[in-house]
Structure formats: C-alpha cells, structure tokens
Amino acid sequence: MQPGPGGDMSALLAQAQQMQQKLMEAQQQLANAEVHGQAGGGLVKVVVKGSGEVVAVKIDPSVVDPSDVETLQDLVVGAMADASKQVTRMAQERLGSLAGGFGAPPGQPPAPAPGV
C-alpha cells in the first residue's frame, strides 16, 4: 500500500495506534461509569454501570403491594430502561468523537452514529 501524497505511512500507523489506545481507554472509563435510572417519580431507582452491570436497585416501600406485583415489575423495567438510555447516550457522547471514521477495536461493536 502506497502512502498518500506527502503522507508518511509510519506516522499514519502511529496516529491510528494512538487513536485506538484513546478509544480503548474511553471504553474502559465508560464501562466503569455509573448511571442512575428511575421510574414512578423516583419510587424505583437503579444504578447501572456502563458495562451493563446492575449495581443497585432501590424500591420505595410504598410501592410494595403484594396484591399488585405487576405495577412494581413495570416500575423496575421502566427504571432499567431509563438507565439503559442513559448508558447509550453516555457512550455516544464519550465514544462518538473518538470512533468517528475509525474502526472499533476487534471484538467491539462500532460506536453508534450521533443522533441515533
């Protein structure tokens, strides 16, 4: 492969390696970051890491009704969905600029396009 006009292949390779390193560091930071999701006006709260690991679930005792378990289940699902949206948004913000036009590291999905 021939370098572009005035281009230096070793400099291009070094730049690509540096970008990949920055992307991997950002992915690691994202995996360790925590987001808080909630539903029912804060009656059910969850804490989820960027990696998807659920760290905590907090349920207000007023929502616990043995005769209406479905409502509590819906609130937990809603809080998880809220946290999932926040993780996606955070990934777009942190990885989008780094991954734009640059392939993701092997085994990693490409970053979502901004505005998706």
Swiss-Prot record:
* Segments crossing the lipid bilayer: none
* Keywords carried by this UniProt record: Cytoplasm, DNA-binding
Q: Which Pfam families match?
A: YbaB_DNA_bd (PF02575)
**Where is it mostly found?**
cytoplasm
Q: Which PANTHER family match?
A: NUCLEOID-ASSOCIATED PROTEIN YBAB
User: Subunit structure, briefly?
Assistant: Homodimer.
Tell me what this protein is called.
Nucleoid-associated protein MAP_0317c
Print the organism lineage: Bacteria, Bacillati, Actinomycetota, Actinomycetes, Mycobacteriales
